[in-house]
Amino acid sequence: MWIYLPALRKTRRIVSKEKSKSFMGSEFSNANMTAPGLEDFSYELKGEEDLNGYSCFMIESTPVSTDLEDEYGYARSVSWVDKDNYLVHKTLYYDFDGELFKTITNKEFKKLEEGEGKYMVTHMYASNHSNNRSSEMVMDKVAVTSTSKSYFTVAYLERE
């Protein structure tokens, strides 16, 4: 994963051992900014529950190895997954002592393509229960267009 920091005009690679670190000083981690590797976790259905009017599955995810626990920075998570469209509305993260340390709530989604069933979270909120801090991320403008692969290079991102 790479991140471009426009204020510094620098591109930085985020290696796997940095997934658990804070994303730009926020309560989100670098791992929270990407889709997780599905093979990195084992899954268990913990139940079904309504959440804010959405009928959801409660899915517990556990990293399949201690190396992956260290990489992601938590021992397990529980997510409320919408039964209709499989969007994740809320996730609780538990530390290595089994204590809840972070909650992420996905408040709004934008459908990216008609008929494709692809969505993007456009409003998310992270609450850190260990330090009582929170962060909110809102993406006001989201557009999906055809993009040349050349845009996804360090040289292109850092051009003047």
Task: Name the predicted role of every residue range.
Residues R12-I14, K19-P36, N52-V154:
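Gly/Pro-enriched, hydrophobic low-complexity segments
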Residues R159-E160:
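Short, solvent-exposed mixed-charge patches
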Residues M33-K46:
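A short, amphipathic edge element
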Residues M1-L5:
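N-terminal mature ectodomain segment of secretory-pathway/periplasmic proteins
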Residues E49:
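Short aromatic-centered micro-motifs
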